[in-house]
Amino acid sequence: MTILSDVKALGQQIWLDNLSRSLVQSGELAQMLKQGVCGVTSNPAIFQKAFAGDALYADEVAALKRQNLSPKQRYETMAVADVRAACDVCLAEHESTGGKTGFVSLEVSPELAKDAQGTVEEARRLHAAIARKNAMIKVPATDAGIDALETLVSDGISVNLTLLFSRAQTLKAYAAYARGIAKRLAAGQSVAHIQVVASFFISRVDSALDATLPDRLKGKTAIALAKAAYQDWEQYFTAPEFAALEAQGANRVQLLWASTGVKNPAYPDTLYVDSLIGVHTVNTVPDATLKAFIDHGTAKATLTESADEALARLAEIAALGIDVETLAARLQEDGLKQFEEAFEKLLAPLV
């Protein structure tokens, strides 16, 4: 047993927030799964770093440049191959839990963040190209992305809804998921295989707010917000309305804690893992945070601890004139811009 196995026994999956060809081909990813890692997430920034720093791509890049393809098509050829290979490594994990774990995420183009129909079309295409049952298509949680979520769920596609900072937007996502499930059930189709995670970003909240807060509140907002979001989750998915869908095979959306590497070196390096362990959740962690947690993290069900205190802390922050929903909208826009910039950098060498 490892600490990751202990976390899994507490109802939380630990995923790796990284993907590269070397990670898969070296056997390192397979070794991480043996330690208790349950899935993988990727994004444009991760692929940009992989393509720039992993020599295993060089020959394929050269070969793809000789073909009459756009830079985006060249990127997708390599990214789809990597995700497919990672899905194969994670397949045994996926099957051992009846399809509940072992997913690998690939994101739609950041250029489509405000285009619901474009997102749906690209997600369908990427899902078909990967052709693995444990592939998850990542979609940003803009209003357009949430509209796309409903359609993709009704299509039977598993989705990672990303860049969530807002409790209100997260609740909108749950409702869209439920509508997609209801449509699929009304059409007489199975829903048991569909898994959706709602990726709620953590450390960026504290990074954005800490400079404006008194010392006693620094480093506390993100965890308080996550705990409040989990209370919202419990209320939504234990209500009679969703219970009726669950009785017909629907899975609950799982909250996924993203951006859980600490940005402030004054904070413990496992802060955003240790503090957010709970049932029906996922935490996707970068390599350094994973190593730190394995070395000196604590496996304890902490997510429901001090729930009232979390709400009181948010009220205290609101009393200072800080609107966390306004902040959430800004952070999502910033995140979209960062992914767009990473995508442009990623494509530049593929021209």
Curated annotation (Swiss-Prot):
GO terms for biological process: carbohydrate metabolic process; pentose-phosphate shunt. One of its GO terms (cellular component) is cytoplasm. The active site is at 138 (schiff-base intermediate with substrate). InterPro entries: Aldolase_TIM, TAL/FSA, Transaldolase_2, Transaldolase_AS. Pathway: Carbohydrate degradation; pentose phosphate pathway; D-glyceraldehyde 3-phosphate and beta-D-fructose 6-phosphate from D-ribose 5-phosphate and D-xylulose 5-phosphate (non-oxidative stage): step 2/3. It catalyses: D-sedoheptulose 7-phosphate + D-glyceraldehyde 3-phosphate = D-erythrose 4-phosphate + beta-D-fructose 6-phosphate. Keywords: Cytoplasm, Pentose shunt, Schiff base, Transferase. It is found in: Cytoplasm. Belongs to the transaldolase family. Type 2 subfamily. Transaldolase is important for the balance of metabolites in the pentose-phosphate pathway. This is Transaldolase.
